[in-house]
């Protein structure tokens, strides 16, 4: 029986949500007997589009495509099961699975535009109530969805994220030891906390550098004064980098730093672990669930906690090596193939 996948994510820049959707679809393509991937015409993820042999339908774009073109196409196909993987879907089409990755907009509404909040607060309850089944990416997110939207726990399944096979250790000699962070100015990512803690670590004798990956041209960076950090010779803002370079930076860092207040899953620390890099994570949201005892935890509200974490992981080689080994074990728990099989089983139970 035909299954249709909403592949509008092919028209979007890649974040964790789009990565999940693409990787799951590449696996589902080989697991389902009859599956179509459909998308609007404004595709930017050309390689994935070709690999999935996706089909362009309709004349609209964005949410309007989901509201008008996609349901019309599904009706012409006999109303098959529709799989939505990226936080959205047609509101009034009932025979669907919807994936909601987190409800950060409920927990930190002050960090989102009012137009975004208005739309999501109208859309998400209708998506949840109008779907046959709901998927999310951690037990923590499942609990959050059920709490905020009063959805039955039996209706929600957890399908974990994983890491691309391209992520693996790539050791190289480096000019100086460094900690690594991937920057975002969203409040819940707690980026300024990293800078403040690192400067304090420096004052207490820390010798390492801090490398920060991210686009400083992003409008969100203009909201704060970064001057006292950009002129620090030990803090290097690297801008956006390719996956190949990201793997090199992960593989040769003293540790990866991820003190986020709130995540649905947390892919970057898992990428770091896959590359043999120990991770420092906030003891918050889903991170203890996903990483167990394989990372060093810090209190995301206490700067001194991260300072101590910098000191411990930089000074204790035995401890650092133990985190690397635990990281490898932890990454073995997650694979796109395993996650896609879980989703396939859900799909097959509904068709």
Model-based region annotation:
Residues 1-351:
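Carbohydrate transferase catalytic cores enriched for Leloir-type hexosyltransferases
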């Amino acid at each position: 029986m035909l299954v249709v996948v909403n592949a509008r994510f092919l028209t979007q820049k890649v974040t964790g949500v789009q990565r999940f959707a693409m990787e799951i679809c590449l696996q589902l393509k080989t697991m389902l007997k009859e599956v179509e991937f459909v998308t609007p015409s404004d595709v930017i993820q050309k390689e994935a589009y070709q690999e999935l042999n996706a089909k362009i339908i309709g004349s609209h774009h964005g949410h309007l495509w989901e509201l008008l073109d996609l349901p019309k196409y599904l009706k012409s196909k006999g109303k098959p099961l529709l799989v939505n993987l990226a936080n959205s879907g047609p509101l009034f089409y009932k025979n669907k699975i919807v994936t909601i990755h987190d409800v950060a907009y409920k927990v930190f509404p002050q960090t989102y535009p009012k137009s975004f909040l208005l739309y999501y607060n109208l859309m998400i309850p209708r998506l949840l109530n109008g779907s046959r089944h709901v998927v999310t990416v951690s037990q923590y997110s499942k609990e959050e969805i059920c709490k905020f939207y009063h959805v039955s726990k039996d209706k929600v399944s957890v399908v974990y994220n994983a890491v691309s096979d391209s992520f693996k250790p790539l050791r190289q000699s480096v000019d100086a030891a460094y900690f690594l962070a991937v920057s975002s100015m969203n409040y819940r990512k707690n980026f300024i906390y990293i800078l403040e803690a690192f400067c304090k670590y420096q004052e207490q004798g820390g010798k390492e550098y801090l490398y920060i990956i991210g686009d400083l041209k992003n409008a969100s960076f203009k909201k704060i004064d970064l001057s006292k950090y950009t002129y620090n010779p030990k803090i290097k803002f690297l801008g956006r980098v390719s996956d190949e370079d990201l793997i090199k930076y992960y593989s040769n860092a003293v540790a990866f730093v991820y003190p986020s207040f709130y995540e649905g899953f947390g892919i970057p620390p898992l990428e770091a672990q896959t590359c043999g890099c120990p991770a420092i994570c906030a003891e918050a949201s889903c991170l203890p669930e996903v990483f167990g005892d394989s990372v060093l935890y810090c209190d995301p509200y206490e700067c001194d906690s991260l300072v101590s974490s910098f000191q411990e992981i930089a000074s204790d080689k035995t401890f650092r090596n133990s985190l690397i080994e635990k990281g490898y074990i932890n990454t073995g728990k997650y694979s796109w193939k395993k996650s896609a099989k879980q989703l396939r089983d859900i799909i097959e139970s509904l068709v």
